[in-house]
């Protein structure tokens, strides 16, 4: 979903949305609980119709007022479903196909877990398993489940994240993510940093937003061996990525554009993506939207191109109940000119609490 810049005082980061239920509020300590059930009934090409979990969650937020604008905060988010990997093997035991089965309610697990401090008018500093400010970059994705081209370091299990308060519509921040394995002999896969700036301004019915981010992280790359060995060997390489986006809105109409590019050191070719989204709010409850994505990846002479078009309609039965219908048509064309189609249609329900 699209990330929106919200004009809030930073001390309110520890507080929750309007959907939250406050279960404790005494002596400067506040605890809120909220969440949402997100289900999609969908049909993809070459698959049967399926009912899947689209990120259902329950979150617990706590804050304690330390005085003089300073507060301590903590956040935990639970999810309920995890995909299960499946391998199809031939009679010789060789893997011929791999895919994931989308489960529903099969695995309760902690998705986010972090704590930190907020200082009113300055910003928040948090430590733990969390989204980084890189996840906030992107303005063109108005869909519920079919698009998005964010290529930045957007989350980390062991992350330190800073996000400033809003200054005249401008917000900035950065994050550092540690590698999963601290052993000096282990690969540094996932370790990196991200910086980003966000600007949002509204004058009457006209709104403008601009966002940009840059990140570097280590990624695991297989080492080519000659002759090929039975045991695969991997090494660290750096992936550098940037993303910029802009949005122009007037009353209920909004047009967003994002561009993303990434490159892995010592690997030929870059990955480039352009996304254009259009959203129109018919009224306070209903909206229609469309989204276009163009992607290109690979070295010269071996480039793969992807094209995706998505359209949808969303309707709020209640301020906390959303329904939608969405469809997308994807085309992937390899360097030999072979085209693979990937179409999907779905209808969904989100109940917030």
UniProtKB/Swiss-Prot annotation:
It comes from the Bacteria. GO terms for cellular component: cell outer membrane; pore complex. Its main location: membrane. Keywords: Cell outer membrane, Disulfide bond, Ion transport, Membrane, Porin, Signal, Transmembrane, Transmembrane beta strand, Transport. GO terms for molecular function: porin activity. InterPro entries: Gram-neg_bact_OMP, Gram_neg_porin_domain, Porin_dom_sf. Pfam families: Porin_4. GO terms for biological process: monoatomic ion transport. It is found in: Cell outer membrane. It is a multi-pass membrane protein. Residues 1-20 form the signal peptide. Structural rigidity of the outer membrane of elementary bodies and porin forming, permitting diffusion of solutes through the intracellular reticulate body membrane. Disulfide bond interactions within and between MOMP molecules and other components form high molecular-weight oligomers. This is Major outer membrane protein. The gene is ompH.
């Amino acid at each position: 979903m699209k990330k929106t810049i919200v004009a809030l005082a930073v001390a309110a980061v520890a507080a929750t949305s309007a959907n939250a239920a406050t279960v404790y509020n005494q002596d400067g300590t506040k605890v809120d609980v909220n969440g949402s059930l997100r289900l999609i009934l969908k049909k993809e090409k070459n698959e049967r119709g399926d009912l899947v979990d689209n990120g259902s969650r329950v979150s617990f937020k706590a804050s304690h007022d330390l005085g003089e604008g300073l507060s301590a905060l903590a956040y935990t988010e639970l999810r309920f479903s995890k995909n299960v990997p499946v391998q199809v093997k031939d009679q010789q035991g060789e893997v011929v196909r791999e895919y994931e089965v989308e489960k529903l309610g099969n695995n309760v697990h902690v998705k986010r877990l972090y704590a930190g401090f907020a200082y009113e008018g300055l910003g928040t500093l948090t430590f733990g398993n969390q989204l980084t400010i890189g996840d906030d970059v992107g303005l063109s994705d108005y869909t519920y489940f079919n698009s998005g081209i964010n290529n930045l370091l957007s989350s980390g299990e062991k992350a330190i994240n800073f996000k400033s308060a809003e200054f005249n519509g401008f917000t900035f921040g950065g994050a550092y993510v540690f590698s999963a394995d601290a052993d000096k002999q282990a690969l540094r896969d996932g370790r990196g940093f991200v910086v980003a700036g966000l600007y949002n301004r509204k004058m009457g019915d006209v709104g403008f937003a601009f966002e940009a981010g840059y990140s570097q992280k280590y990624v695991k790359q297989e080492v080519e061996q000659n002759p090929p060995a039975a045991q695969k060997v991997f090494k660290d390489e750096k992936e550098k990525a940037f993303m910029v986006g802009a949005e122009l809105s007037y009353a209920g109409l909004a047009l967003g554009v994002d561009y993303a590019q990434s490159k892995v050191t010592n690997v030929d070719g870059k990955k480039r993506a352009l996304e254009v989204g259009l959203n129109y709010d018919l009224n306070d409850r209903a909206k229609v939207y469309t989204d276009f994505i163009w992607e290109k990846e690979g070295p010269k002479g071996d480039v793969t191109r992807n094209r995706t078009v998505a359209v949808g309609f969303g309707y709020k039965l209640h301020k906390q109940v959303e329904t939608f219908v969405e469809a997308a048509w994807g085309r992937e064309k390899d360097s030999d000119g072979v085209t693979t189609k990937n179409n999907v249609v779905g209808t969904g329900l989100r109940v917030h609490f």
